[in-house]
Amino acid sequence: EIFAFISDTPLGSASIAQVHRAELLSGEQVVIKVQRTGIYEIMARDIGLLRKAVKLMPPISLKGMADFDQVLDELWNVTREEMNFLTEASNMEEFARRNADVVYVRTPKLYQEYTTMHVLVMEYIEGPAIDDKEKLLAGGYDLEEIGIKLIDNYIKQVMEDGFFHADPHPGNVKIQDGKIVWIDMGMMGRLTERDKELIGKAIRGIAENDIGMIQEAVMALGEFKEKPDQSVLYEDISELMSKYGSLDMGEIDVAEVMMDLMEVMKENKIRMPHGLTMLARGLTNMEGVLADIAPQINMIEIASRHISESMWKDLDWKKELKHAGKNLYRSMHKAVEVPGLAADALHGLMKGQTRVNLDLHASNDLAQLLRRLVRNVV
């Protein structure tokens, strides 16, 4: 009554669902995402086994490590969101609405009337994956232009919308008719206005080389059971600033910055909110895509432009002039030129990955269980 044709062979298959190509009676080409039978129970069982494994670990093995219960709670929450296709449908609609004015970006058309918690029907996208350089070049595309627009839009999702794709691997980004098409909205991240405000505060601290301001932002953003040693955190941030402060933006490696930031947060036992944890994953994927299709592009340079523009646009001039004076604005005007800005702009954006950056050497069995679960979730 709905489909004229459904392919028996799946276009793709993962632990949670399979995707089949189909044709509506109207002739429209679509894909059907069908959830695997019993997957909810299977995932719930796996999480339960992991919780039991954590309880069996000797207490000494947890010293200095992340809060496993919290990590498992986060994994379970993310998994449940992905298993509700109505949530993904809502994400698609919100993403399309927020990017309606971006002429080079789109998302597949959603067929809401055919979508349920366990079945999602959307437009079939005919086009190469964003990392298929051979097909893109054969189609006359400029890889550098694609890379710039990809990152520009992603930073817009993060800094302006506070609603971003949290799993932007190459299979989830295609090129069709000159546009970047974002697909698979099952895993999306959000940043609150407070998150963005505090990130902005950290950036301003970097622009002024004000380690205390950065530290205040980090403390306000982070979550911790015991208050970190302020002097140690200050010294760690100072050391990080000195490491990247002499580099040009184009010389800064995002992956290296992330590793350093994660280590600082881990050493100070600071965890980031869920949204920033998701952002860490997304930015890592973005860096990988860029390295493949246009390695000459530096993501931090593009991000810094957005950050600088956002700071100017969002400033409350009367309030800021009263409290900070004109020198603050001269400092922010130089934001793009400050080498340390880009490295630490990610301070508030990427350090959340420490929540899942676990040191599992104490238990190989648990490490294997976690790896298996993560593969299932992904």
Predicted regions and their residues:
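Conserved catalytic cores of large enzyme domains
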Residues: 1-378
